[in-house]
């Protein structure tokens, strides 16, 4: 409970994801610190339209607004030395070249404890320990399962 857990709520989550977050916080008694974009999802959509097509300057701006800026704010507020994340080496080509310990943005050491696990091993771990799971997660900054949202590529 003493360790702050940062969650960037980009505002485009599914109802199942919001329920999942509530379950996880309650189940694990987390000290969740929620960071949201300065512009809500409804505001963004009203001003800019729907989520932009991938690999466009508009999508890059979208990612900065809804994911990268709130993350930067959280990192500036907490100034952590260590950034724990849940990436795995088998998620995409970019991540295959990373390691369990890497240097990250904001002068952090990124630690990926599940880096060498497969998706099946993670699912077994979750199931064996009766942990809440969310199969309905969608990250609009990635758009597709094997893309990056931008956080891991920043140094």
Label the predicted regions.
Residues 1-155:
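Nucleotide-activated chemistry modules centered on ATP-dependent adenylation/adenylyltransferase
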